[in-house]
Amino acid sequence: MQNSAEKEEFKGYLEKSGVIDALTKVLVGLYEESDKPSDALEFIKKHLGNSLGIDVDALKQENADLKAEVSALTQRVDDLSKKLEAANKQ
């Protein structure tokens, strides 16, 4: 169990690093929502990322695009490897 000095030190760390402020802003935003979201945790994740200047939807799209590109390049490597193998057999 942590002693009170350790807890105060950790609290100070969270305040100095902006964590408390960011969490407070997101929770206030959730509180002020007229239509409460069905998934409060998803709201917090999305808006916490936004408060840090991160566009979660854009990152998800970029991730999907990169996965598709990796898949296409993997297929191309496989195709070229087969061609090289066939050429080396001749």
From Swiss-Prot:
Superkingdom field: Eukaryota
Biological processes, Gene Ontology terms: regulation of DNA-templated transcription
Record key words, sorted: Nucleus
Entry annotated with the keyword Nucleus: yes
UniProt-annotated location(s): Nucleus
A GO MF term: transcription coactivator activity
GO cellular component: nucleus
Main localization of the protein described in the UniProt heading: nucleus
Gene3D superfamilies tied to this protein: 6.10.250.1060
Entry keyword Transcription: no
Entry's family note: Belongs to the AMY1 family.
Name of this chain's protein: c-Myc-binding protein homolog
Species of the source: Dictyostelium discoideum (Social amoeba)
Designated gene of the protein: mycbp
